[in-house]
Amino acid sequence: MADYLISGGTSYVPDDGLTAQQLFGAGDGLTYNDFLILPGYIDFTADQVDLTSALTKKITLKTPMVSSPMDTVTEASMAIAMALTGGIGIMHHNCTPEFQANEVRKVKKYEQGFITDPVVLSPKHRVRDVFEAKARHGFCGIPITENGKMGSKLAGIISSRDIDFLKSEEHDLALSEIMTRREDLVVAPAGVTLKEANEILQRSKKGKLLPIVNGNDELVAIIARTDLKKNRDYPLASKDAKKQLLCGAAIGTHEDDKYRLDLLVQAGVDAVVLDSSQGNSIFQINMIKFIKEKYQDLQVIAGNVVTAAQAKNLIDAGADALRVGMGSGSICITQEVLACGRPQATAVYKVSEYARRFGVPVIADGGIQTVGHIAKALALGASTVMMGSLLAATTEAPGEYFFSDGIRLKKYRGMGSLDAMDKNVSSQKRYFSEADKIKVAQGVSGAVQDKGSIHKFIPYLIAGIQHSCQDIGAKSLTQVRAMMYSGELKFEKRTMSAQVEGGVHGLHSYEKRLF
């Protein structure tokens, strides 16, 4: 007892851990796995943690999550889901200006619960087409119209009960022979409210789809019973002053991007991201000034940057937020190929510490593999995190599912991959290579395992961030950052063996289910 008893009191507590300034002041480039946050004191529940965060100077989100402007991550479906769950989606620009503007328009015109662009078939399609649609999209409740398109007269509906017990030799049957015909359907008129539609479905007790038709009996939308269940209430939804969902879009920094910008503004875009792998350029500075002169109220997210010196030029030009990251994404090989970039944790801390002096929020872009990485990025000063691979292969991500070795996958590629560059010149412009005869790839193309729906995945991420803040002892992300800058929040570097210890180890086999 006497060997270690020094004092009967507990007023003395030794100084422990490193401040953020000490952690990142040594000159080492650190990633999210290189350190941990030391826990604090808990006197509240996790669900009390406020995750409200600034996306830009004028746009605030209730959850700090942004989907990346990549052509295998964000189009209208992803942007809608992100906004409904409290974040925002940034529409990619590896497409025509008209297509991109139309995707933004879909988000801004979205009415909760109504599906305006469903899979539609015609009576002439075959049963095998339904099975193919089911394999691609994961469902087989499909409206049938006269010409197989929206806006055509409703002819019937195909559901799983119509095809489940058909023999393989019957897969060539025309849908007109087996579908539930129009006269046997319960429909709702255009203009019906979500509440009224819900009541109609409950009363009818027929099927899983409710077609919405206009006065000419033409299909204008559908409502799925499963969607009614999950769309009843989105208290965190990101909306503008007109109660429309928030939506962002990426553009380049070239002269022809000004036309794209005009179309996006006409579509109602809330923020534009100047999409460049290296944002500290005269091209981006000039584009920021042009936008601020022509569309004063439009929020401009500039980047990408990884140093305070880069950030200074974009802030001086009028940027409303900064996107931080260079070469840290899972499909990015910029650091390997060009020897330029910065480890992501260091980049986020250094740029955030500088930008906060001017009231400019930072988006941590790249290197996010787990919910723990999100918590670390936010604790280092980022206001929001941008996710690519973490959201790839969700139901709402663009692309079709395919199977490999029995695993359901979706394609995921970097915008600096040759695959993406070959699709559209916008991807080449992002890396200043549109005029090059020889393209230098700064990304790769691959596949990611099916993660299910955003509506299940994002709530898991939200809960994880809240529990992280609880362990830290902070009731809000604002408090987390205040603790970090004051030096109250402490960190500790991890050796390689510490990282092994912090992961799953010592098991013969295990199943890792996150939610």
Swiss-Prot record:
Coiled-coil regions, chain positions: none
Binding locations of IMP: S330, D365, G366, G367, G388, S389, Y412, R413, G414, M415, G416, Q442
Pfam family, one: CBS
Subcellular locations according to the entry: Cytoplasm; Nucleus; Cytoplasm, Cytosol
Residues at which NAD(+) binds: D275, S276, S277, G325, M326, G327
This protein's pathway: Purine metabolism; XMP biosynthesis via de novo pathway; XMP from IMP: step 1/1
Keywords: CBS domain, Cytoplasm, GMP biosynthesis, Metal-binding, NAD, Nucleus, Oxidoreductase, Potassium, Purine biosynthesis, Repeat
MF annotations from Gene Ontology: IMP dehydrogenase activity; metal ion binding; nucleotide binding
Function: Catalyzes the conversion of inosine 5'-phosphate (IMP) to xanthosine 5'-phosphate (XMP), the first committed and rate-limiting step in the de novo synthesis of guanine nucleotides, and therefore plays an important role in the regulation of cell growth.
Protein name: Inosine-5'-monophosphate dehydrogenase 2
Organism per entry: Xenopus tropicalis (Western clawed frog)
